């Protein structure tokens, strides 16, 4: 039996640990365009996917070398906003960030290098639409079937990551005008507060966010929102509208009574509790009225004592 030469085995294995390393034999067989893309991906892999940076100097070096992916105020790979220096260092040195970078490169490694984007022709654009059923570039996830992909795109995780990506785009636009990263974060918070006022983007009653008005309309006619409206009307009926406990508790988590510091599971339990003696005894109005009756009870006693002395 004949065994292949060690050089041939090394050439077949690729000669390296990285997924984008290629042998001279493969490079000789590949077209120029494919070899160029492979070289770009290999350079990006070496620049980003090495060991996790340790210390401030390595983190700053990584940011300067890959400004298309990382900045001092945001990580485009993780869709994370970095509002302080300590948060920036902790994020870029974390294992979670390193794993997401590897997944990002597995999807985008052939397309991105130092801010350059490949120009796609019509065929590539049509293939990109088909790739949506295979992977989600926003969440860095892969799918086994179009059904799983559609379920992901309609889920909360994708909506949350899409919102974070939109926020990171706003941060990038603001950072071009504002040099102070902390001023950028405060300005972004102001924009977020304005969005929370828009009912097509945020439901203050259920603490839910929406990507488009159609999704918002579906929420407002849904069972969850109607249940919250019923709860609010019930609170108002029993004099609880001005109680901040209605908004302090998470949406859909029972019926809170801040006076007694308990949460009831149903409307019937809440009605029975509010009508009961224990709740009325703990009510501030009852305590105030009982305190006001104390001097009224002492006055007739004093008058009786004076009449007896006379």
UniProtKB/Swiss-Prot annotation:
Compositionally biased spans, kind Low complexity: 1-12
Which terms in the Gene Ontology molecular function aspect does this entry carry? double-stranded RNA binding; zinc ion binding
Keywords of this protein's UniProt record, alphabetized?
A: Acetylation, Cytoplasm, Isopeptide bond, Metal-binding, Nucleus, Repeat, RNA-binding, Ubl conjugation, Zinc, Zinc-finger
A Pfam family:
zf-met
Which domain of life does this protein belong to?
A: Eukaryota
Q: Does the keyword Ubl conjugation apply?
A: yes
UniProt cross-link Glycyl lysine isopeptide (Lys-Gly) (interchain with G-Cter in SUMO2), position: 114, 170
Q: Which of this chain's residues are annotated to bind Zn(2+) 1?
A: 75, 78, 91, 97
Name the InterPro entries for this protein: Matrin/U1-like-C_Znf_C2H2, ZN346_ZMAT4, Znf_C2H2_sf, Znf_C2H2_type
Task: Using the record for this protein, list the coiled-coil segments as residue ranges, or answer none.
Answer: none
**Where is the PTM N-acetylmethionine found along the chain?**
1
About its domains, the entry says: The zinc-finger domains are required for binding to dsRNA, and also for nuclear localization.
Q: Describe the subunit structure.
A: Forms a heteromeric complex with XPO5 and ILF3. Found in a nuclear export complex with XPO5, RAN, ILF3, ZNF346 and double-stranded RNA. Interacts with XPO5. Interacts with ILF3 in an RNA-independent manner.
Query: What is this protein's function per UniProt?
Result: Binds with low affinity to dsDNA and ssRNA, and with high affinity to dsRNA, with no detectable sequence specificity.
Name of protein: Zinc finger protein 346
Q: Which species is this UniProt entry from?
A: Pongo abelii
Top-down, what is the taxonomic lineage of the species of origin? Answer: Eukaryota, Metazoa, Chordata, Craniata, Vertebrata
